[in-house]
């Protein structure tokens, strides 16, 4: 047990370094910097390259990684945060998430995605402590963290620039009027935070012994969780949150096994969000309650199509593509249609009500496994299983997320992100039902009214019908009285509540609708590919769906179809590698948010 606690403290030490950087940036800019985790991952891989490939001593590699990470943080601030500092929260949130995608996949392209041994420039088991052997590397990591925290505290308390940071965090406008160089202070916060993140990545690699771009980046994500648990904007809370998460992770693995790690980490995070959203040490007003989208991403009006436009599109999509493109183009079309079915209802959730879900892969996974199991275990017909999959996804996702809709702002995004990891953890761990990491194989192909859908052209045309129904339902909802109410909830929730609207209920309803169609898409995916495993439903799927919606226009259902065509169809048709695709997605999101925030299929209001 002692070695488990010490292991938790060592992990928590790294998480604390990452969390401090996240809290520092949030305190100064009010931005939840999702890219901080990727800086940790990139710093870890850069340290491996300096030590293993170039043969540098560890202290020189540490300094080089600190400098390189600081530079990366400065670039992220310059390109994705500073230009959007006056925009609604969704803008910078999505931009930093996109920067995270770019950095993660750039790391995989540069260093390769495989797992490799991390160099051990310092002894790892030469210090006996209470029957457990620690290493000089652990002592150096602890010492660095303590020294960094003490120096940061003293600097913020007594240093001139530190006082400027505190003034900017308290009120940037007032600080600017008093002569504080707010822009320089914001740059400084990114430099310091990124430096801490990169160094934390090296310490993680030294302790873990083996590393890959994904594992290092995930460590950064857990550091973000630690910052939120401790309280965004609180340095002391970030340190405490890091050690709490580290201990919880180690004790959970010790008691239940490594398969439950994500369940413990993100389950605890979700619990803290529900019981004390501002964190253990954070201010109750740290994350402001305001519309996430405002008029920034929702300013455009969707371009309307005449009836004959729809007829022409239906003929081209339904007949020309399978006849002229054959099975290859039809296979691409099925993927486009499935992602469009997920994305179109998101225009209600994100566009109308202003709620950003970073875990939409969760209801997709629930629907996929529900449909596959209903057909394989209970022998239900495909169409009935398809509908039930949507219902199961809507009910389960809504029940699990029901408490989070009382939250505001960034909290909803963070909670849905946690939900995505929790669902994946349950799928991986529930071997008796889901077969865990091995997945479900031999899922029957769809059969509609006695007609089996065996070839790609059949799958594509059926998916197209489901997409058409999805578009019809969402267009009708947007044009109805309910659609008007949802827009009022997203535009100004306080005003909507003052008019007697039960805003939380409308958010829940909108999420249930989006989850229902996501479940349908998951069922289609399961039966058309005949195989499922947890790696299909990663956070990258959720990010891709959100990217599709942003590209097409938050308020444009047909824009979501075009977004799916551009971001799913074109890369698939061009046979781009997965890493290159996600890198492209990140760049597209940043460009759209910066230069065309209303999306492609909209006109300015």
Where do the language-model regions lie?
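Transmembrane helix-bundle core of multi-pass membrane transporters
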Residues: 83-84, 89-158, 185, 209, ...
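Helix-loop-helix "hairpin" substructures at the membrane interface of multi-pass membrane proteins
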Residues: 12, 133-211, 235-240, 305-306, ...
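Transmembrane alpha-helical segments in multi-pass inner-membrane proteins
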Residues: 15-20, 55-67, 187-275, 345, ...
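Single transmembrane alpha-helix segments in multi-pass membrane proteins
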Residues: 2-51, 75-91, 183-184, 188, ...
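Hydrophobic core of alpha-helical transmembrane segments in multi-pass integral membrane proteins
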Residues: 68, 142-152, 273, 309-323, ...
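Alpha-helical transmembrane segments within multi-pass membrane transporters and channels
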Residues: 22, 55-99, 106, 240-245, ...
